[in-house]
UniProtKB/Swiss-Prot annotation:
Organism: Vaccinia virus (strain Copenhagen)
Source taxon at top rank: Viruses
Name under which the protein is recorded: Uncharacterized 7.9 kDa protein
């Protein structure tokens, strides 16, 4: 799951940069799914509440009856 960008060499000036890329890849592989979850969960809850309120407002219409029986 961990992305390694570049090959760190012992006598190379790119040691810090490859280490930085490893840290960025490590945090991105771990934190980005949690960020997506935390961003998408409130939108899903609000859409769910909107659909429930729409069904309760138009309770006696044919559309809500067909949705309930489906």
């Amino acid at each position: 799951m961990l992305l390694h960008v570049g090959i760190p060499l012992s006598n190379n000036s790119l040691n810090t940069s490859t280490l930085g890329f490893d840290v960025v890849a490590y945090f991105s592989t771990i934190l980005i799914p949690f960020l997506i979850l935390f961003i998408s969960i409130p939108f899903e809850i609000s859409n769910f509440n909107k659909s429930i309120s729409m069904l309760s407002e138009h309770r006696y219409s044919n559309i809500s009856k067909s949705l309930i029986f489906l």
